[in-house]
């Protein structure tokens, strides 16, 4: 059997004849070698020799040299058809050279393909810049001539550009190193051997430049946007004149502001009140806040004052409407200049005016007949016009302005209707915050709320009939109780006494009706509580209740005398005792020594006054066993324990134990 006929790698095999056309473009070395001259597979020795002690392998077998010409290269048969050239390995970014890096400008816009020196220099105000560490690195690299910097050069650029990052504090340098190694937008470049110095370079990876180029197109917020400068407007070029020229022709922007882009971008950060345009040499008739009866003249580019206001608001200039009356248009007599606060206010304040509801005369819904005559400047009219209250703001700001305008026309006054400064009810003015008109407001001493009617304060809560409106501004409106605070005292006892009086009157208890007649001194007042009405006593009650007037009995404190004593006290005081003493008349008398320290709710003070000089504490409930009379029965002790010594937290004891301890 021929070896070549069974070899699948030879074209002569019938299985590979169809695939011969695929390899027609092989090099000449593959095509011109005759198949018969190529040797078969090399023969491998049947027994392979092992590894010697030295660790080197012995030669297994040697290939047979080809018998063809020596000029033709020898290619083994088993690699002839499967041979392919692998792609060259791509070195890592750290091994790239400077010559292999190609910077491609992004195709976003032509302005991004500028040179490094054309980028604006960030403004340094001494504070921490509003940029991340990655953005600072990108700003430094993208502004370098070669678009590459060493680590020390990045440190120098950041510290020289921003004074906040000084070299004395090395904390930010650690953050720079971490961002360089972890951020995918930066790559490390090895320094060429022929370039003096030490340290590798850092550059921006191709394709990541856009995020750092966006910085030069970044715009600040709306509040910090400065308005373009406005030239002076003369009386010859006014809105509404018959010249037919556009109103924007008089507002020429200075061309030197936009010569250099970095200078224009720096203006965003240096916006202040000094950059706001000021309008001078303008007649007061041209800047009246309300529309007049004169019809508007069609002007190319401007259809109505609303369009003018909209375009001016886009430019950051306060809305200005020039309106003249028929009489003034005929006479053309100049008037004193008007200094409007809106012209000196910043764009942020003009936006705040719109949010607070200050609208133009057209949006307020005023008719042509409501147009007033020229009056004093706006800055002098705030004292004459009252600030609308909360009630007016609820009815509607438009109705308030309309009513004020009609009132001024009926009276025949020549004062101009001006829109007063509006202040939100929930936001009181502060000494440091200006109102929308630009004038400093002082903090009001009282609450700007309407006086509540007396129907909201019933007589139960109001103890004075001569309540005036000033009383509602002294204290919080949340307090439902109003007492006479003319004699305010800092003594806590006095305050507690007044508080008890107010609570008794508010609850309308029976004790409160006779509180003033029964208590003639502070000592008697402190003994009065809503829960202990039977202990009320005064000079008359103490005189009537004596030992001699008590009924005859075995002792003073037997069952009959005790009930008579309590009934007499309640009848003298004119009050009704909450509960009767449910003591039985069948038990024997107690000794005086036992009842003295006894803590009974209804008669503790009576016996302490008559029999002893000391007052029993309401929390002391000690009873000594030796003072208990032998005639005391189980029934009487159990009744006393359940009635006069309630203890919901204690467990009930057996009856035999209660006989000995009463607990």
From Swiss-Prot:
DNA-binding region, residues: 128-222
Gene Ontology CC annotation, any one: nucleus
InterPro entries with a match to the protein in the record: Fork_head_dom (IPR001766), FOX_domain-containing (IPR050211), TF_fork_head_CS_2 (IPR030456), WH-like_DNA-bd_sf (IPR036388), WH_DNA-bd_sf (IPR036390)
CDD domains documented for this protein: FH_FOX
Biological process according to GO: division septum assembly; negative regulation of transcription by RNA polymerase II; positive regulation of transcription by RNA polymerase II; regulation of transcription by RNA polymerase II
Keyword terms, alphabetized: Cell cycle, Cell division, DNA-binding, Mitosis, Nucleus, Phosphoprotein, Septation, Transcription, Transcription regulation
Region (Disordered), start-end ranges: 220-241, 325-387
Coiled-coil ranges per UniProt: none
Subcellular location per the Swiss-Prot or TrEMBL entry: Nucleus
Biased composition regions of type Low complexity, renumbered to the chain: 340-355
Keyword Transcription (UniProt): yes
Modified-residue entries (Phosphoserine), positions: 446
SUPFAM superfamilies linked: Winged helix' DNA-binding domain
MF terms in GO: DNA-binding transcription activator activity, RNA polymerase II-specific; DNA-binding transcription factor activity, RNA polymerase II-specific; RNA polymerase II cis-regulatory region sequence-specific DNA binding
Stated role: Required for promoter sequence element PCB-driven, M-phase-specific transcription. Acts as a transcriptional activator with a role in the regulation of mitosis. Regulates septation and the periodic transcription of cdc15.
Name of the protein in question: Forkhead protein sep1
Organism of this sequence: Schizosaccharomyces pombe (strain 972 / ATCC 24843) (Fission yeast)
Gene: sep1
